[in-house]
């Protein structure tokens, strides 16, 4: 078992290990003293798999447990469903001293976390990620959001959890496509961290993802969040590959998975940086080869103009400038502010038509 301590506006632990769902109640009780009710919110995929195990553990720890779920998938991450969660809180007289438990993947964590952030100006939150992507990325760092028709994660808040529990048993039976999605974010961390981690990933992905690799990804995010909790500068590094990814997701009406989009965006940026002499062709080729090895796509399916136009809705844009995260070598990534009108050129150099 690994425990990573996060220091932000709220300090908390990220606990990673096998069999943690069975003991989650006691851990949650220790993290949120005084809470009487625990509201477990999940989706239609996770509910039949893990909800009973979590609720039984919470009841054994003395909580009064409420539970609800919504339809799985990015299309559920809407203002309407977020409002439905808030109505559930009010109908069941949840108080600020209680705790909300987000049990599931990134969509669950984002939307339930945003509801917790807003309800009565903030109720305590515990994240229990059940996908690889959520475990290494979205459950940590406090970003919560829902989507709008104009773009991804355009309404949201920073709301740090009180605890993150990652039971690695839930990651062993993921469908291949969901596992691949998580590999995309892990590769991103390898590029950010450097040759040592990236070389390990080349040897282990996609078949083996040891606990210490999960922990290292969380540590990387922890350190970046500690330096820039509210995403005004250094935290943009975590968006490596994500500007093109979010644009592609929007253009696909969210039929394209987040991990697939990140893989495409990461390949595109690595190629563009190699073309501009910012990184070596060898580094770009290694990134693309690892993405292919994991069974992830490497080519953006939309034109550079369409992607650049969609990127104008990106929440990181500041007026006429758009921050892009460039690859200048493994372990050497930089936030560069470019004219939004120049972004199509980067995309073309990355392979978009």
Each model region followed by its residue ranges:
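C-terminal charged capping/lid subdomain of soluble metabolic enzymes
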Residues: 184-187, 278-353
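Solvent-exposed alpha-helices and their adjacent loops that cap or buttress functional pockets
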Residues: 93-95, 118-119, 147-148, 155-158, ...
